[in-house]
């Protein structure tokens, strides 16, 4: 009888593991991002001797599908209407769609919207989160643009602000607009990182935390998204050692809730 009972418990455990995302991705504070098998949508990085070594942050596009899936099925598991103010290339939309939730994603790039449709068969909306009406939502999954690091073809985006100060001012205005349409109890998943360019350090993760506090959002969790296993560390280290700073091989997943 004991053996039969044990067998039933084992089978039950296996069945649970198929449906519980916490079995697929360990709910711990350091998440090892999986390799996506390509350099990124915007093309390969130029590592030639005639070019300066670019910021390691430029390897972090597109959005990691495993992170999107984990957010959709774990942090947003009890949410239904997910908004994305920077919809991007479609990975997040697909993850939300696969988890049987509603997704509305705004993006100012026709190229990104076309890619999302062609690659993932999802329909993002050509709209600007700075000016267009924000939909009511109870969840959010996004990754904001990294000023002076990535440029889109539309000149209406935050990435085209002429200074870091102007970027941060408009960044806060955008989040004020978005969070006002979030229902009480909403959960936000924001993937964000820091980077260095031309010897200047840009702390977008800290700036985002400050903005969320101003918007009345409460911190719920923070996860380190580690790219250590898939980053070209050996290529980055010489310049880091010469200038005395660390190579950025991680991003953050900031989880916020609206009271």
Q: PLM ranges: what are they?
A:
Residues 1-259:
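Class I S-adenosyl-L-methionine-dependent methyltransferase catalytic core
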């Amino acid at each position: 009888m004991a053996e039969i009972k044990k067998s039933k418990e084992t089978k039950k455990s296996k069945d649970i593991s198929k449906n519980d995302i916490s079995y697929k991705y360990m709910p711990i504070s350091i998440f090892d991002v999986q390799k996506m098998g390509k350099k990124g949508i915007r093309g390969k990085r130029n590592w030639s001797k005639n070019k300066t070594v670019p910021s390691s942050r430029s390897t972090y596009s597109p959005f990691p599908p495993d992170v999107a899936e984990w957010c959709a099925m774990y942090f947003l598991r009890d949410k239904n209407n997910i908004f994305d103010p920077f919809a991007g290339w479609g990975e997040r939309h697909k993850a939300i769609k696969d988890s049987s939730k509603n997704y509305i994603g705004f993006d100012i790039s026709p190229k990104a919207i076309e890619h999302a449709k062609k690659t993932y068969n999802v329909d993002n909306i050509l709209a600007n989160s700075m000016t267009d009406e924000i939909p009511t939502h109870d969840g959010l999954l996004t990754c904001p643009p990294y000023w002076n690091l990535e440029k889109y073809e539309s000149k209406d985006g935050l990435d085209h602000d002429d200074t870091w100060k102007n970027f941060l001012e408009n960044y806060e205005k955008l989040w004020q607009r978005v969070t006002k349409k979030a229902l009480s109890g909403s959960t936000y998943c924001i993937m964000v990182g820091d980077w260095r360019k031309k010897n200047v350090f840009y702390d977008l993760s800290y700036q985002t935390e400050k903005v969320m506090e101003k918007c009345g959002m409460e911190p719920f969790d923070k996860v380190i998204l580690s790219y250590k296993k898939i980053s070209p560390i050996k290529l980055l280290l010489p310049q880091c050692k010469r200038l005395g700073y660390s190579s950025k091989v991680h991003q953050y997943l900031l989880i916020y809730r609206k009271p």
